[in-house]
Amino acid sequence: MTGDRELQALLRLTAWLSPAFPIGGFAYSGGLERATADGLVIDAASLAAWIATLISHGSVWNDAVLLAESHRQQPSPAFLAEITALAEALAGSRERHQETMLLGDAFVAAARAWPDEVFERLPGKTAYPVAVGAVAGAHGIGLEKVLVAFLHAYASQAVSSGIRLGVAGQRDGVAVLAGLEEHIVEVARRAAASTLDELGSATVQADIASLRHETQTTRLFRS
């Protein structure tokens, strides 16, 4: 039965972080669209570098730390409310704030298909990494597995955005994902051992791109 529970947990994690899960993640680029327009991302190599940097030093790293702490502290409604407020404060632009909160709400709504008391502990509006961490933790899914899947889902979405923006083809996109595997594992392990003291980013160009996207006239994405 233990093996069955582990496989069931894997199925849930795969479903929750699948591109088919109805949260609307395809509508957001996290500033990548602006970075492409500004010539910061021009090909598969620069796309890979952009993704890797955000995962290890940018907003995605912060999301991973928030996810990890939410996974550990999911029994506490007060903590989940506090860490959601922290996630909102860390959003560097209006669109970034909108992205994390709308994705979080959509994730919670869809994940209710797997009933659990954790949904009663979540605040009325929940940031995306907080929602993923708390729900996965309540379902007993290992933290490192959740982080690897979460980071890979981000990378996959960013690659898909890059393909739609014309900076990489499909084969190049697959190669970018393959090349990021070791990096994702390393960052996931680091995030699993992190505390909130390790929050912080050093991706100024990405933050500026997210801000500049708000005034971009022609665009495919909401961020």
UniProtKB/Swiss-Prot annotation:
Q: Where in the cell is it found?
A: Cytoplasm
Mind listing the GO molecular function terms for this protein? nickel cation binding
The family database entries (Gene3D superfamilies) matched by this protein are listed as:
Urease accessory protein UreF (1.10.4190.10)
Kindly indicate whether the keyword Lipid biosynthesis belongs to this entry: no
Keywords, ordered alphabetically:
Chaperone, Cytoplasm, Nickel insertion
Gene Ontology CC, one term: cytoplasm
Query: One of this protein's Pfam families, by short name?
Result: UreF
Family annotation (InterPro entries) = UreF, UreF_sf
Its family remark reads: Belongs to the UreF family.
Q: How does it assemble?
A: UreD, UreF and UreG form a complex that acts as a GTP-hydrolysis-dependent molecular chaperone, activating the urease apoprotein by helping to assemble the nickel containing metallocenter of UreC. The UreE protein probably delivers the nickel.
Function, as annotated, reads:
Required for maturation of urease via the functional incorporation of the urease nickel metallocenter.
What is the protein's name according to its record?
Urease accessory protein UreF
Task: List the source organism.
Answer: Rhizobium etli (strain CIAT 652)
Give the taxonomic lineage as stored in the record: Bacteria, Pseudomonadati, Pseudomonadota, Alphaproteobacteria, Hyphomicrobiales
